[in-house]
């Protein structure tokens, strides 16, 4: 009897079913996951550091709510799209001409997914535990309530949407419309899908210390001598030559007491060998133990991976761009990411527990890990009955409420405003139109 060779993508998932009011995706090892689509609450270039800190606190609260035996996976998909605006047939000629001018213009769209995964028992068979199953749905409901309470836009994906999401991830095609799949060719440096290259850039090499000693939920950049706050990875919206970037962020919450005992024993072993590297390791462990004794933080296993799709002849400039930008953040990406196919399959939604703990996961505090989560969204149209369109930084028309009081978000209750502009710029035309 001929032996059937197992493929890399065989058995990634066990089942997708709708049960107990939730659409649950089961991994090959039986870990259940529920997927939210959400919008990052911080607008890009808002310059407000407090917004980054508040979102960090929300994510920290989600981790505290989930607790041991759960993983939080967040995927930010930055994909190139072609602009299209639905214009009514009875619209005025100037309105139709205005939107036709921008038709087909390329822009970057950010779509964010938050995935809650429960760890399964490590045994030969997956055993059903009714208490764990009820706890899983209770934790998901609590996360849903927390996001709603903090006014973060989100929703649960339907069964059809989860199915399409997983298939689009496999094809690495997130443009609107139909998509197709083709053959994969894996190497130590990248994956080749048709004429495109997909390369994974893990941010952390567990064998080297290439991270900043102190990290914040935001970065500071200087504009005309003023320090403004921005996301650590805001440059992902401007990666040259790329058609799609997926930033996969995974945080696993292990059993805390067992891990604490392991760290205490490791600190003693490092202290028995007084060379510089062991002294640094012992000092780091002792600082972590002090933080855990004082603050309500968690020890977590983390993985941060950037998957970039680009033409085959543009891998070098894309790599140089990412390494330069990450170096400005004090991060040196891993140089030993030779398991490209494994990194790709482990980054699938709901596969948070598929990473190899020996070389793909690093141990840190939950506060530090959440600082590396992407927190921004791009400027979008405001919900207002008074539609006035201006172009944003990508050169696309967005609707804004020029009064500040007619839209869904009220900026002011003052009805008085004035228009400033040079001669011939259309001040009178604008005022008469509004």
Tell what function each PLM region has.
Residues 21-22, 26, 380, 387-392:
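Glycine-centered flexibility motif
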Residues 48-52, 56-64, 384-434:
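Glycine-rich phosphate-binding loop of nucleotide-binding enzymes
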Residues 1-377:
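Extended, folded cores of ATP/NTP-driven motor/assembly subunits in large transport
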Residues 140-141, 382-385:
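A short, compositionally biased
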């Amino acid at each position: 009897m001929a032996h059937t060779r197992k493929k890399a993508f065989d058995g990634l998932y066990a089942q997708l079913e709708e049960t107990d009011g939730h659409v649950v995706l089961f991994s090959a090892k039986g870990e259940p996951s529920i997927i939210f689509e959400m919008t990052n609450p911080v607008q890009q270039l808002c310059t407000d550091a407090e917004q980054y800190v508040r979102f960090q606190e929300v994510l920290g609260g989600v981790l505290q709510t989930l607790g041991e035996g759960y993983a939080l996976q967040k995927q930010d998909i930055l994909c190139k799209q072609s602009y299209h605006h639905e214009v009514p047939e009875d619209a005025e000629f100037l309105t139709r001409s205005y939107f036709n001018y921008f038709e087909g213009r390329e822009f970057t769209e950010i779509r964010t997914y938050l995935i809650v995964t429960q760890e399964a028992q490590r045994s030969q068979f997956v055993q059903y535990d009714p208490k764990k199953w009820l706890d899983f749905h209770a934790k998901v409901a609590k996360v849903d309530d927390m996001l709603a309470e903090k006014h973060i836009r989100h929703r649960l994906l339907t069964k059809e949407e989860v199915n399409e999401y997983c298939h689009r991830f496999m094809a690495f095609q997130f443009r609107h419309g139909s998509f197709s799949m083709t053959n994969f060719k894996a190497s130590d440096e990248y994956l080749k899908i048709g004429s495109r290259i997909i390369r994974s850039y893990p941010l952390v090499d567990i064998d080297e210390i290439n991270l900043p000693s102190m990290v914040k939920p935001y970065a500071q950049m200087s504009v005309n001598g003023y320090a403004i706050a921005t996301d650590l990875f805001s440059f992902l919206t401007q990666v040259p030559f790329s058609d799609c970037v997926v930033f996969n962020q995974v945080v696993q919450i292990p059993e805390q007491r067992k891990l604490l005992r392991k760290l205490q024993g490791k600190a003693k072993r490092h202290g028995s060998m007084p060379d510089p590297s062991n002294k640094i390791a012992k000092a780091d462990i002792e600082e972590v133990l002090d933080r855990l004794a004082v603050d309500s933080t968690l020890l977590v296993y983390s993985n941060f991976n950037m998957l970039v799709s680009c033409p085959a002849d543009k891998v070098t400039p894309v790599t140089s761009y990412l390494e330069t930008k990450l170096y400005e953040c004090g991060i040196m990406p891993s140089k030993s990411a030779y398991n490209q196919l494994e990194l790709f399959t482990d980054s699938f939604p709901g596969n948070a527990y598929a990473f190899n703990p020996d070389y793909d996961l690093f141990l840190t505090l939950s506060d530090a890990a959440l600082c590396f989560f992407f927190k921004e969204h791009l400027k979008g149209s405001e919900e207002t009955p008074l539609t006035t369109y201006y172009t944003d930084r990508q050169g696309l028309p967005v609707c804004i409420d020029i009064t500040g009081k007619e839209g869904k978000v009220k900026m002011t209750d003052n009805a008085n405003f004035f228009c400033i502009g040079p001669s011939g710029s259309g001040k009178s035309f604008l005022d008469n139109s509004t």
